[in-house]
Amino acid sequence: MSSLVSLEQLCVEFDDRRVLDNISMELEKGKITTLIGPNGAGKSTLVKVILGLQKPTSGKLVKAKKLKIGYVPQKLKLNDSLPLNVIRFLNLAGKYSKQECLDALRLVGAEHLIKSNMHRLSGGENQRVLLARALLQRPDLLVLDEPAQGVDVQGQIDLYDLIESIRHRFDCAVFMVSHDLHLVMAKTDDVICLHHHVCCSGSPATITQHPSYIALFGNAARESLAFYHHDHEHHHHDLSGSPVSGDATSCSNHNHGHHHHD
């Protein structure tokens, strides 16, 4: 797999306060990487760095040449007083034909929404339209910030299934910020646990056993996910039907105290 984005000892400071400390990571073509961490851990800042919206204070950021990034924001604020249907919304970021818009919407199962009012979409419908907008660019890297926020449980399952299918269809990298721990563990290749620095990173099966993960998310999260692993690993497959890997995990032993996840 080839690296699309590489961070080496990257730091970001605001008013002498270090928000990101010595971050080293890679986003690879064809892989889903999920970022987790408590509120105020620097997750949004890291996303901005990768999108090119925040300059690092120090360290190195390397992106593949001509890298195309599709971005699905956590929240989309639209002026309620301005009528805006889906096809007009999709064309705000560029000029696309009706067929191109239909094709993108069809990929996410939302072609029937092309003439719908953006203000009347459900949480799940809204996320699918945002995903379609990102796919219009045929991205090499898809960045999703809390993609399942405001979506019901079944909608979350469907959305993560969709993201996984998009990864395979486009052979793109996916970088996702999420707090839906159960669903994340089933659908991701790698997990990065962030609390200003990288506390631990690696495969889902090993990350949940690490003391840094337990310190951030508590024993309840570990026990709940232990049940998830027991329920699925005895079949040697995760929820997506893929074999469970035993990849090694790289972790650092920092004491964080107990925090609630966002």
From Swiss-Prot:
This is Zinc import ATP-binding protein ZnuC. It is a peripheral membrane protein. Pfam families: ABC_tran. Keywords: ATP-binding, Cell inner membrane, Cell membrane, Ion transport, Membrane, Nucleotide-binding, Translocase, Transport, Zinc, Zinc transport. Residues 5-220 form the ABC transporter domain. Part of the ABC transporter complex ZnuABC involved in zinc import. Responsible for energy coupling to the transport system. Residues 236-262 are annotated as: Disordered. One of its GO terms (molecular function) is ATP hydrolysis activity. It comes from Vibrio parahaemolyticus serotype O3:K6 (strain RIMD 2210633).
